[in-house]
Design a protein with these regions (language model features):
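Short beta-strand element of Class I
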Residues: 19-21
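Helix N-cap at the beta1-alpha1 junction of Rossmann-like dinucleotide-binding domains, i.e.
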Residues: 26-29
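N-terminal Rossmann-like NAD(P) cofactor-binding module of classical short-chain dehydrogenase/reductase
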Residues: 62, 68-72, 86, 93-94
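N-terminal Rossmann-fold NAD(P) dinucleotide-binding loop
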Residues: 3-7
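Conserved Rossmann-fold cofactor-binding substructure of NAD(P)-dependent oxidoreductases
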Residues: 49-67, 74, 78
């Protein structure tokens, strides 16, 4: 998954990342990644077990390892506990996705932005949304405004996955987060306010360089929120992502039978969340790399 990709990239830049501690609820996964990387990098790698929902455990781990920065690649539900631990230890913080309550399929920056003054007073930095989208797409937009244009009024962010993993249905990142995102209402920013749409209501076609013509659908995405706040003169920001017909057909069937629900149900005397159960039976995104062929194309217009 994304954590493995990030750790590989850090290890390729050992002059900057001299030492890394990989921590997860399942330490064996960290150990396997360490073993895979040993002999390929000068970066010293340690591993640890931690529950990212437990602030005290996080504080203890940070104090033991004493890192310069915590790179949060856990679930979005865990952003705030990790930020609390960074505040308590005065450690810089980076993440790739904004906070989302586990029991509500709604993500926005307000919870994390509320930490701004606390981090400022502690003398530490929190860098939010540092993936590709959000992340690089924000850099593209800010660079264009600073160096290429006097004013930018409209931004469309397009995310095209032109790869094929050979499965009838699988997600390229955490299935639980992916399905919550694409099955939620869409929204875009226009003339100073949010416009909400039904899931997959707005569809467009676009000819992506190196990929070809693809169907894309308007989604809510967190960088719309940050760009609307930080791009003076902006009138409209939208986010589109491509999906193949097989993906959409499977998703609709799963929705129809209740498998995308986040409401707990009782099954054989145990409480389960249908979407979390679905995640357990779908292919692990970390396993898709070797069998995926094709290109991706992400950018701003």
């Amino acid at each position: 998954g994304v954590a493995s990709v990030a750790i590989h990239k850090c290890s390729q830049n050992s002059e900057a990342f001299e030492e890394i501690c990989i921590a997860s609820r399942t330490k064996s996964k960290c150990d396997a990644l360490k073993e895979k990387l040993e002999g390929t990098t000068k970066t010293k790698i340690q591993t640890a077990q931690v529950d990212a929902n437990n602030v005290d455990e996080l504080i203890a781990l940070i104090e033991k390892f004493n890192p310069d920065v915590v790179l949060n690649l856990a679930l979005p539900y865990q952003d705030l506990t990790i930020m609390d631990a960074c505040l308590a230890t005065k450690t810089h913080y980076i993440d790739t996705a904004n906070y989302e309550p586990e029991d509500t399929a709604k993500f926005e920056y307000k919870w994390q932005w509320a930490y701004r003054e606390k981090f400022k007073e502690a003398g530490i930095t929190a860098l939010l949304g540092s993936g590709f989208d959000p992340g690089v797409t924000g850099v593209f937009s800010a660079y264009a405004l600073k160096h290429e244009f006097d004013e930018i009024n409209y931004i469309d962010i397009l995310d095209c996955n032109g790869g094929d993993h050979g499965y009838p249905f699988a997600t390229n990142f955490n299935p639980e987060i992916n399905i919550r995102e694409v099955s939620a209402n869409g929204s875009y920013w226009e003339d100073g306010h949010w416009v909400e749409t039904k899931p997959m209501e707005i569809k467009r076609e676009y000819d992506f360089d190196g990929v070809g013509m693809k169907d894309m659908y308007l989604l809510h995405h967190e960088e719309i929120e940050s760009l609307a706040l930080n791009m003076p003169g902006i009138k409209r920001i939208r986010f589109f992502m491509t999906f193949g017909q097989s993906y959409l057909t499977h998703l609709k069937c799963l929705e129809n039978v209740g498998m995308t629900s986040i409401e707990p149900i009782m099954y054989e005397g145990k409480e389960i969340v249908p979407l979390q159960f679905l995640k357990a039976v779908l292919p692990d995104p970390a396993s898709l790399g070797p069998r995926t062929v094709g290109k991706t194309n992400i950018g701003c217009i």
